[in-house]
Amino acid sequence: SYKTPIEQIKAKNPKGIIFTGGPRSVYLDDSPRMANEIFELGVPIFGICYGAQFMVYGLGGTIGKANENAAAEFGRTECEFDTTCPVFDGLKKNSVVWMSHNDYIEVLPEGFKAVGHSDKCPYAAIENVEKGFYATQFHPEVNHTEQGFDMLGNFLYKVCHCKGDWTMKNYAEEAIKQIRAKVGDGKV
């Protein structure tokens, strides 16, 4: 959650962080925000739609207001990707994604480059390899985005180096171990 204190996030020692999308604008006072310290944790971050705009704005880039002539896109949109970017590694160079935004990335922060674009959106996907920061103006998490789950998987496994070996059995064993440690010889 955007409301999670930075100390709590540090304590969890995350392998990566994903900023989700939403209908807000970074210029509104009541928009979800985190302390900019989040960018100094040394862990990979993936921003989705509003999350991408939040990242860009927080790191010194500029967010513009979309209109019929400037990057307004809603629905299925054809994008072209740089497949040397780890997020798009092994994927098709051209793909349909789901766009839904009123604001757009106008100027990139220092160290970022475009790794995906559409006809109206020059920064449909961006990266800062040195920091491990990636972002998409579109929504890879929805079914309408072709290869979207593969993009998220690439972030988790190729960028964050997560293992993907979680099972319900492992969870149950770990939960039982933690409960026993708390309860001791007591009855549960």
Range-by-range predicted roles:
Residues C49:
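Conserved G/P- and acidic residue-centered "switch" motifs that form tight phosphate/ATP-binding loops
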